[in-house]
Structures are given as structure tokens and as C-alpha cells.
Amino acid sequence: GLPICGETCVGGTCNTPGCSCSWPVCTRN
């Protein structure tokens, strides 16, 4: 869906469901 999750993942993890870490931001498929 939307490529931007509005979350950063500098620590390496994303808390938003359906989002994965594409450092340094979380992205959605």
C-alpha cells in the first residue's frame, strides 16, 4: 500500500503492523 509508514527504524525495528524496516524509515509493501 502506502510506502511511508510515518515511523523511523534507526534501531532496526518497526512497531507499525505491516511495516518493515528500510533504514532509517519504515516502509509498507
Swiss-Prot record:
This is a cyclic peptide. Keywords: Disulfide bond, Knottin, Plant defense. There is a cross-link at G1-N29 (Cyclopeptide (Gly-Asn)). It holds the Pfam family Cyclotide. PROSITE patterns: CYCLOTIDE (PS51052), CYCLOTIDE_MOEBIUS (PS60009). One of its GO terms (biological process) is defense response. Disulfide bonds join C5-C19, C9-C21, C14-C26. The keyword RNA-binding does not apply. The presence of a 'disulfide through disulfide knot' structurally defines this protein as a knottin. This is Varv peptide E. It comes from Viola arvensis.
